[in-house]
Amino acid sequence: MPAGRAARTCALLALCLLGAGAQDFGPTRFICTSVPVDADMCAASVAAGGAEELRSSVLQLRETVLQQKETILSQKETIRELTAKLGRCESQSTLDPGAGEARAGGGRKQPGSGKNTMGDLSRTPAAETLSQLGQTLQSLKTRLENLEQYSRLNSSSQTNSLKDLLQSKIDELERQVLSRVNTLEEGKGGPRNDTEERVKIETALTSLHQRISELEKGQKDNRPGDKFQLTFPLRTNYMYAKVKKSLPEMYAFTVCMWLKSSATPGVGTPFSYAVPGQANELVLIEWGNNPMEILINDKVAKLPFVINDGKWHHICVTWTTRDGVWEAYQDGTQGGSGENLAPYHPIKPQGVLVLGQEQDTLGGGFDATQAFVGELAHFNIWDRKLTPGEVYNLATCSTKALSGNVIAWAESHIEIYGGATKWTFEACRQIN
């Protein structure tokens, strides 16, 4: 470029810069830039000044595009999963000849397929109602048997007369249910009759529940604080008991209890202890066709217990963090032992202790297929390993039997939920 033209270019650029800003920023300095002959000098200067801003905007746009792309990919993956699940459902409906009935009344849920709220479901609404009524009647009969036993011990003529009245009511209800079963089998009865009979039976059951609850309340007022049992009559995800106290940090423990169950397959979960970050900190469970197991920090040991014969059994498990050594006792006799069960892992404090349910989350996440069905009493925990003699004293109801120094069986320490019940129980006097 000739020297004269370059000088004119610098002069024009200086005029553009001076015209673009009215403020005085101190001594003026001139910057010469080579540009094409036909270019607009002022426009070129402004473009050079905004280059950084444009570059920043481009980077922000690129980041936004990448984020949107990730969101779209995630949504596509979700759509693919939902489509696959829908396809499986449709294929099962096509292959299953009873799909229509299953949709109308529910179907049997396979273990491990997800949360189950009520265990086994019946084929039709009517059959389901009758099944639930039968279970309720059985629960009421069991409660009356306990009241009868209590009245014998206390020689209460008023309790006996009321018990006889309630027993006759239950017998009448059983006849109504049996009659309804026969009607269903013969294919008789319409929706209106179904509704009327169900309302009548449910009304009678409600009245019975109230009367029995009054009896049990009077029974509770007169019994010692540790002479009681918990009953879980149904396999649900809402029936449980919670111990008000938590556990301290423990480097050894012994847990003992009385259990009675005839549930199959598996009696369920007598107790579970969960802490933040670990739902299986300490669990006793018998699920499906597996043997009973003890879990510590999600580590498992199989126990030699056989208790689902409908009889009362006393069980104890001892453990120490040193080498993870454990021992299992049934009815006062050691039946198994092992080591390397969560060695050198202390039981963590400040958790939630639940009776009758397995926790998938802290204090919840219950699954009906893992619920305990049966009766439980004298649940005690010590922060040490009991000796075989001490365990034997517990199983034989010796006067030397100890109460738990961490968790002691007391009615004031237990809260019940969802229909679980408490009534009088005296170990060794009422067993089998």
Swiss-Prot record:
Binds 2 calcium ions per subunit. GO terms for biological process: axonogenesis involved in innervation; cellular response to glucose stimulus; cellular response to potassium ion; central nervous system development; chemical synaptic transmission; mitochondrial fragmentation involved in apoptotic process; mitochondrial transport; neurotransmitter receptor localization to postsynaptic specialization membrane. Residues 90-122 are annotated as: Disordered. Ca(2+) 1 binds at N280, E358, Q359, D360. Keywords: Calcium, Cytoplasmic vesicle, Disease variant, Disulfide bond, Endoplasmic reticulum, Glycoprotein, Metal-binding, Neurodegeneration, Secreted, Signal, Spinocerebellar ataxia. GO terms for molecular function: metal ion binding. SUPFAM superfamilies: Concanavalin A-like lectins/glucanases (SSF49899). Ca(2+) 2 binds at E358, D360, Q370. Residues 1-22 form the signal peptide. The keyword Protease does not apply. Gene3D superfamilies: 2.60.120.200. Its cofactor is Ca(2+). Its main location: secreted. Residues 226-428 form the Pentraxin (PTX) domain. It comes from the Eukaryota. The keyword Phosphoprotein does not apply. Glycans are attached at N154, N193. Transmembrane segments: none annotated. May be involved in mediating uptake of synaptic material during synapse remodeling or in mediating the synaptic clustering of AMPA glutamate receptors at a subset of excitatory synapses. It is linked to Spinocerebellar ataxia 50: A form of spinocerebellar ataxia, a clinically and genetically heterogeneous group of cerebellar disorders. Patients show progressive incoordination of gait and often poor coordination of hands, speech and eye movements, due to degeneration of the cerebellum with variable involvement of the brainstem and spinal cord. SCA50 is an autosomal dominant form characterized by cerebellar ataxia, oculomotor apraxia and other eye movement abnormalities, and cerebellar atrophy on brain imaging. This is Neuronal pentraxin-1. The lineage of its organism: Eukaryota, Metazoa, Chordata, Craniata, Vertebrata. The gene is NPTX1.
